[in-house]
Amino acid sequence: MPKFGTRSKEQLATCHIDLQVLFNTVIEEIDCSVVCGHRNEEDQEKAFNSGNSKAHYPEGKHNSNPSTAVDVYPYPIDFNDNERYFWFAGWVLAKAKILRNVGEITNKVRWGGNWDGLKNGVIDFSYNRSPKVLNDLPHFELIQ
């Protein structure tokens, strides 16, 4: 069974309890790494200036304390393997729905690769979107 390393545990501990419960459940079956939980002002502005965020501090979901957003990468990490991210996101979102249905978490979860939600009952994985839409494949956030 995979386990989180020290850095992943530290990052996840900065997140809302729903994200902690969700990803502590996910790691039992899928190896992954938590790269970012809470972002302070300096880290958020770096993310914005590098194009990794559309939000200035304190507007990002990573900026709340505890954070209502988390960036998690499936192993092995391959930034060019979109299929792996889609598969991982499907797993995470399915686990989130199950945990919410049984009352272990209270919030819905949105994935950063699908800001537009379901269209005709299908997740839109196309990359033919407006350039204003950030495809943030490792990003998961709570819908409160």
What are these model-derived regions, one by one?
Residues M1-S33:
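Active-site acidic/histidine clusters and adjacent loop/turn architecture
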Residues K3-F4, E29, F48, V72-Y75:
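Solvent-exposed, well-ordered amphipathic alpha-helical segments
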Residues A13, I17, E42, E83-F86:
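Generic alpha-helical secondary structure signal
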Residues F23-N52:
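Extended, low-complexity, intrinsically disordered C-terminal regulatory tails
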Residues G51-G60:
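Cytochrome P450 catalytic domain signature, combining two hallmark sequence patches
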Residues E59-Q144:
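Catalytic cores and adjacent binding grooves of peptidoglycan-active enzymes
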